From Swiss-Prot:
Enzymatic reactions: Zn(2+)(out) + ATP(in) + H2O(in) = Zn(2+)(in) + ADP(in) + phosphate(in) + H(+)(in)
GO biological process: one example: response to zinc ion
Organism name: Wigglesworthia glossinidia brevipalpis
A Pfam match: ABC_tran
Protein name: Zinc import ATP-binding protein ZnuC
Gene field: znuC
Chain sites annotated for binding ATP: G37, P38, N39, G40, S41, G42, K43, S44
């Protein structure tokens, strides 16, 4: 399972608006790939194409026939009128036994949350639970859409350390969608700079000198993490 996903000349249109323009790259087994780009660059759309949630308007998406994937969404909403514990949430649409759920919570240092209400969790705790739930099917590929959104720097460091830990345990491929550098460059094998089309693609060292990367993020210093300032 060397290449688990192969995207060839992918285009996505919403009406006449071009969201993704001629996207081609391969996802290799065991690699961590970060897709960087500003808001509105098509990052989440690309993630959904990879997951099969959106069909491309043109182009070809080839997946390994035995590929198992998991998705950690950017946001998840819980109805405050419906009481639900972490344990119940972990078991929704799941055939896994309680002890297995507990085991996967342990992997992300969140086993103490098992009986807590999902409504009472912090942003960082919810991300841990979502990450744990993404492991239940023992995926070959995990796609994380803006996993550190709303977390402070310390929370981001903790979550990225957990992602690195999971990568080591499962030897799976991971795609991280982001618009911030922060610690991403130190935690990834390959980087794709996206703004509807791929502006540059390669190892962090290779793309950090690329004109398109510098235009988007400024000069990257490995000793001083560059931070892309964005507006909400």
């Amino acid at each position: 399972m060397e290449n688990i996903v192969n995207l060839k000349n992918i285009f996505v249109f919403y009406g006449k608006k071009k969201i993704l323009n001629n996207i081609s790259f391969k996802i290799s087994h065991g690699k961590i790939i970060t897709i960087l780009g500003p808001n509105g660059s098509g990052k989440s759309t690309l993630a959904r194409v990879i997951l099969g949630l959106i069909l491309p308007s043109h182009g070809k998406l080839i997946k390994h026939k035995k590929l198992r994937m998991s998705y950690v969404p950017q946001k998840i909403f819980f109805d405050i009128n419906i009481p639900i514990t972490v344990e119940k949430f972990m078991n929704l649409n799941s055939f896994f036994k309680k002890n297995n759920v507990h085991k996967f919570l342990q992997k992300v240092n969140a086993e103490h949350l098992l009986k807590k209400s999902i409504h009472n969790l912090s942003g960082g705790e919810i991300q841990k639970v979502l990450l744990a739930r993404s492991l239940l099917n023992k995926p070959h590929l995990i796609v994380l859409d803006e996993p550190t959104q709303g977390l402070d720097i310390n929370g981001q460091n903790i979550l990225y350390d957990l992602i690195t830990k999971i990568h080591g345990i499962l030897s799976c491929s991971i795609i991280i969608i982001s618009h911030d550098l922060h610690i991403v460059m130190a935690k990834t094998d390959e980087v794709i700079c996206l703004n509807r089309s791929i502006l540059c693609y390669g190892t962090p060292k290779k793309i950090s000198d690329h004109p398109s990367f510098i235009e988007m993020f400024g000069c990257y210093n490995e000793k001083k993490r560059a931070i892309y300032k964005h507006n909400h």
